[in-house]
Amino acid sequence: MSPTDNQHTHTDIQHMTDIDLTGVFPAMTTPFTPDGRIDYDILAQNAQRLETAGVSGLVPAGSTGESATLTHDEHIDVIETVIDSVNDVPVIAGSGSNSTREALNLSERAADAGADALLLISPYYNIPEQAGLKDHYRTIADAIDIPQIVYNVPGRTGTNIEPETVATLASHRNIVGYKAASGDVGQISSVVEQTRSEAFSVLSGDDILTLPICGLGGSGVISVGANIEPAQTTAMVGAAVSGDYDRARNLHYQLAPLFEHLFVETNPIPVKAAMEYRDYGPGTLRPPLTDLSDKHRKRLESILDDLDADREMALAGQTEVI
C-alpha cells in the first residue's frame, strides 16, 4: 500500500530555512516490483541504509529515480516514503518539470510533504531562452520558501543554463545551489567563480567529475554511484573538501571504474542492475527503459566484485580501508 493510501500527513514538520550542501547526496533509485509497481518497503530500506552509511542527504524522485515514468501521486509518495524513513538527513526532493505551472505544483506538494529542499531540473523539450529559465526558477523560488537547487543537465533537457544565468539566480535567497551535469568543467569553473560571493553551493552531477569539481571549489555531489558505494564516496568527498587530495585521489581511482560504468548505458539502467547484484532491490525498470545488456552487466559485476575484494583486503589490513 502506498503512503497516499495510508493518508500520511506532515503538517507538524517545520521546513528548514537553511541546508548544508557539503558532502554526498545519493540520487536515489525507485524500486519496482516485477509488474512495475513501486516497492515502498525496499525504498524505505535503501533510504535507511544510505543514512546509516553516513551520507549528507537523500535525493528521491529525480532522473535516477525514473521520475519521468512516475505519476504525480507516485512522485509525492516516493518523497514521503523517504522522509518518513530517515531520522536526521535532509531530503532534497526532485520536483522539476518542463512546465513552470507543473513544476510549481509538484514543488508545493513536495514542500507540504516535508521536503527540506528542492532539486529543479531545467525545463526540457521546449528549450526556453535564458530569460525564460530565469523566470521559471524565480517563479518557483518566489512561491516556495525552502532551499532550491538549480539542475543543469543539457544532455537530457536540450537547454544549457549559462553561468551568467546561474549567477543571477544565485542572488535569490531561496536558490542556494547548482547541480552541474553539463560535463563542461570550464563552464562549471565559471559558475563557481561567479557565485563565490553568494551563500551558494556547486554540486557535481557526474560522479567521475566530483573530485575536479571539488578542487575548483564545489561542495560535493548528487551521486548515482553512492547508491552502491555510499561510505566510500562520502570518504572521497570528505577528503577533497578538507584538502586531503592525496587520499581523495586514491579513493577516486578506486571508484572510477564504477563511476564510469554506471553511465555505459542510459542512467539508471546500470545502477538498477548494480542494486540488484548487491541485493539492494529489484533491477526492474519502467518502459521505455530496458535491462542492461549482457556484455555490460558482466563488466559491471566484475567491477563490483573487485570493490568487494578490495574491501576484504582492507579489513584484513593489507591495503588502505576505503
What are the roles of these predicted feature ranges?
Residues 1-18, 318-322:
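Terminal disorder- and signal-encoded targeting elements
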Residues 15-157, 314-315:
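Active-site beta->alpha loop and helix N-cap motifs at the rims of alpha/beta catalytic domains
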Residues 38, 214-322:
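Structured C-terminal cap/extension of enzyme domains
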Residues 43-47, 163, 297-304:
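Short, amphipathic alpha-helical "lid/cap" segments that border enzyme active or binding sites
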Residues 53, 77, 81-85, 109, ...:
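Alpha-helical structural signal in soluble globular domains
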Residues 152, 175, 287:
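Glycine-rich phosphate-binding "P-loop"
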Residues 156-254, 259:
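Catalytic alpha/beta core domains of metabolic enzymes, predominantly
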